[in-house]
Structure formats: C-alpha cells, structure tokens
C-alpha cells in the first residue's frame, strides 16, 4: 500500500477545518497590523539560501531538499520563508515604494530534511511576516507584538517572549573573538559540528543541542557584554517600546537564532505548558539589516519572524483552547420517488446552493431511512423531504433536525423558510 512520504502528513476533512480556522485568524491579525500577503515560488535557486541562511547553518549543511540538477541552475525547495520574500522584494523593486517599511506576510509549505518527531515534519507549514525598509526600534517591537498578539488571540496563556540583542557588526566581531578564545581550550571536547564552527561562526556553538550541557556553555561570554554604545541604545529602545505595548518579556543573552542573517534584535516565543515536549519554541525571528543588500538589493534593513503552524496547532490542542468548529451542512435533501422527484431534488439543491446554503443530497440510491442517517452524519441542520406526493403538490416537508419539528413549505419558499427558521433559532 502506498504511504505518504516520511515526515509528511495528509490533512483530511475533520482536521483541515482546524487549519482553516488558524489560517483565517492569522490573516485577520496580519490585516490589523497592515501586513499584505505575498506568495513566492516553493523552490528557488540553491544559491539564494546558501548566501542568505548561511553556509555553516544546519539548514544549508544538512536539511535542504535540493532538486536533481537540470540545466545550469540548481534549485532547492524553500526551507524557510524570509529569503524568498526578500528576494521577491528585490526582484520586483519594492524598495522603490514611497511608503516604507514594506510590510508583508506569507503562509505556505517549507521543506527540511530532518528527523520527524512530534510537531516537526519534513514538509512543514509556516506563517511569517517581514517588515523591510525601516531601522526604527518601534518596528522591532511591533513585529514582536504581532507575534505575541497572535498567540494571545488564540487564547494561549502559557507562553513567554524571550529577547536578545546580537548587536551590530562591530559588536558581533568583538563577541566572536571572545567566543573563540573561550572555546579554543575545550574544542576537542565539543561535537564535530561545533569544532567546525569554532572559527567560521562560533556564535552557532551556543545554539548546539549536543553540547548544550557542556560546562563551557554556562560560562560563555555574553553578547550583552560586547554591545557598543549604539547597539546598547538600540536594544534599550526596543525594550522600552515593548513596555509601551504591554508585552511581557525576558532578556536572555544566550538566545541566538539558527540563521546567519540576524543582527541586533532576536526573539523567540516559547510554550511553558506542561506536556508540550522538549522543543518549546513556537516562534522565532529577528532583525536582518544586511540581507537585502546580500541578495542584490539596496542597503535596507528588515525584521521578521516565522511561526510553524504544526506547532501552533499542537499548542492549541495542548492547552485545550481549540473551539468547536462548525463543519455541518445547512440542509440535506431527502428524496425518493419517480424521475420527476429526482429532477426536482436536483433543481432545488442548486437553488439552495446559489442562495448561499451549504447543501447536499444522496447519490447512492438509499431509502428514506438511509438518507436520514446520512443527514445526521453530515450534521445537517435541516432536511428537505421530497416524494411523489410532495412534488405533485409543488411542496416539500422541511424538518428541523435539532427540534424534530416538521412543516410543509411550497417549493418556491423553501430557501426563505430555512433562513427564517435559522434566524429564529440563532443558527
């Protein structure tokens, strides 16, 4: 029997409605903050990700799905959304718009070759925002506030916001040198990945899952000790803006993001709920002031974040805040009789759909009893009953499936009667 590829899942009716609910709320929150949707290809040139995400990152070294090469260009399924959005920003010259920052959001599948586990897939789905074109600390705070507000809008309570500053280039270089001096004496005790990163990108050592309990991690120099005055002032303004927005946060100097393009502000939103699992990060993001220029555009700053939808839904389930979703039909037509009954059912079904009702009928030739059972399974609020007698009289029996009450209605008035009864019952 054929199965879905490892690390993927089929979203079936009964489950996909939850996804639609989540996606609709995300679109609503995006609109409140004036973010417009952008849709980019699911594959890009491999070079885009090696240049932007970073050659020493786990994503580039271990997790990318690169397509079999045909022709001169090599393509990779997108492992994250920011690089593609920034590429589209440059390609389509959105930097020429008079109103900056350009505020964009995206939603769609990403692909990473990693070990599947609870809430983590090889085809994952991500929502994210990018605000490109402003270096105002208030934009950093707004982006963090949007992410925080999204989780609160779903009713999640057991979350926390963690922030850090990675500083500007001068600050990062000073911190980089300090990290090399710190880890050099114990390099032989670290994993192979950390050893290879020591001189290329020592900041990534702090994000290592293998060596996170090594004593040297606890005593590693903090980036906050190496921020120059400009970076320190910028971070203080971000925190002041967060205070003004009412966003509670913790400053964690050990927080680094797994992508190389981050500068200044970095943040994560984490779950503190029991039973959520070992991976508690729900959302991550930060500022990337050099990325637009690296991809071939002008020197313009940006900031954004990404939310994994699988992990968001897992958090909603874990805290028990998913609402009961309306998935049933408005009306089901129960019809049995001669040919004219069938044709009348077909005409009435189309009329009801054009009137805006979610409607269906039996296509298996079931008897009345079987059709009523089908209406129950489909959670129909009303059934319209048609037989030879009803059609001959130009009428139908309309049954409220909640109360069991049944009335005769002229065929021409069925839609209006359903609407009247629905409004009266508050359905």
From Swiss-Prot:
Gene3D superfamilies: Anticodon-binding domain (3.40.50.800), Bira Bifunctional Protein, Domain 2 (3.30.930.10). Its EC number is 6.1.1.21. The keyword Aminoacyl-tRNA synthetase applies. It is an enzyme of class 6 (ligase). GO terms for cellular component: cytoplasm. It catalyses: tRNA(His) + L-histidine + ATP = L-histidyl-tRNA(His) + AMP + diphosphate + H(+). It comes from the Bacteria. GO terms for molecular function: ATP binding; catalytic activity, acting on a protein; histidine-tRNA ligase activity; transferase activity. InterPro entries: aa-tRNA-synth_II, aa-tRNA-synth_II/BPL/LPL, Anticodon-bd, Anticodon-bd_dom_sf, His-tRNA-ligase, HisRS-like_core, HisRS/HisZ, HisRS_anticodon. It holds the Pfam family HGTP_anticodon. It is found in: Cytoplasm. Keywords: Aminoacyl-tRNA synthetase, ATP-binding, Cytoplasm, Ligase, Nucleotide-binding, Protein biosynthesis. Transmembrane segments: none annotated. One of its GO terms (biological process) is histidyl-tRNA aminoacylation. Homodimer. Belongs to the class-II aminoacyl-tRNA synthetase family. This is Histidine--tRNA ligase. It comes from Exiguobacterium sp. (strain ATCC BAA-1283 / AT1b). The lineage of its organism: Bacteria, Bacillati, Bacillota, Bacilli, Bacillales.
């Amino acid at each position: 029997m054929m199965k879905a590829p490892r690390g993927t899942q089929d979203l079936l009716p009964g489950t996909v409605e939850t996804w639609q609910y989540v996606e609709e709320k995300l679109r609503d929150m995006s609109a409140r903050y004036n973010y417009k949707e952008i849709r980019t290809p699911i594959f890009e040139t491999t070079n885009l990700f090696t240049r932007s995400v970073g050659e020493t990152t786990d994503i580039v070294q271990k997790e990318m799905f690169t397509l079999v090469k045909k022709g001169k260009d090599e393509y990779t399924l997108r492992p994250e959304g920011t690089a593609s959005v920034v590429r589209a920003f440059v390609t389509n010259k959105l930097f020429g718009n008079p109103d900056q920052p350009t505020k964009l959001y995206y939603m769609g599948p990403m692909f990473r070759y990693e070990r599947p586990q609870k809430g983590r897939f090889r085809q994952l789905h991500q929502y994210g925002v990018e605000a490109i074109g402003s270096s105002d600390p208030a934009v950093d705070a707004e982006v963090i506030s949007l992410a925080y507000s999204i989780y609160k809008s779903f009713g999640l309570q057991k979350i926390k916001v963690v922030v850090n500053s990675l500083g500007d280039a001068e600050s990062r270089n000073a911190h980089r040198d300090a990290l090399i001096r710190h880890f050099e004496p114990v390099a032989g005790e670290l994993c192979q990945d950390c050893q290879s990163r020591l001189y290329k990108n020592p900041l990534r050592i702090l994000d290592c899952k293998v060596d996170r309990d090594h004593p040297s991690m606890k005593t590693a120099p903090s980036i906050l000790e190496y921020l120059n005055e400009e970076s320190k002032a910028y971070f203080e303004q971000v925190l002041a803006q967060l205070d003004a927005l009412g966003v509670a946060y913790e400053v964690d100097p050990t927080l680094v993001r797994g992508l190389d393009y981050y500068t200044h502000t970095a943040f994560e939103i984490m779950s503190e709920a029991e039973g959520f699992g070992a991976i508690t990060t729900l959302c991550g993001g930060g500022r990337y002031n050099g990325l637009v220029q690296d991809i071939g555009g002008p020197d313009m700053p940006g900031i954004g974040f990404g939310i994994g939808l699988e992990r968001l839904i897992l958090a909603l389930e874990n805290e028990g805040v998913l609402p009961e979703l309306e998935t049933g039909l408005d009306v089901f037509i129960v019809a049995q009789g001669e040919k004219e009954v069938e044709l009348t059912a077909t005409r009435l079904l189309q009329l009801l759909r054009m009137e805006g009702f979610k409607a269906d009928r039996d296509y298996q030739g079931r008897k009345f009893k079987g059709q009523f059972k089908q209406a129950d399974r489909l959670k129909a609020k009303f059934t319209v009953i048609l037989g030879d007698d009803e059609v001959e009289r130009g009428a139908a029996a309309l049954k409220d499936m909640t109360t069991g009450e049944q009335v005769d209605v002229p065929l021409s008035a069925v839609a209006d009667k359903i609407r009247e009864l629905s409004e009266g019952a508050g359905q």
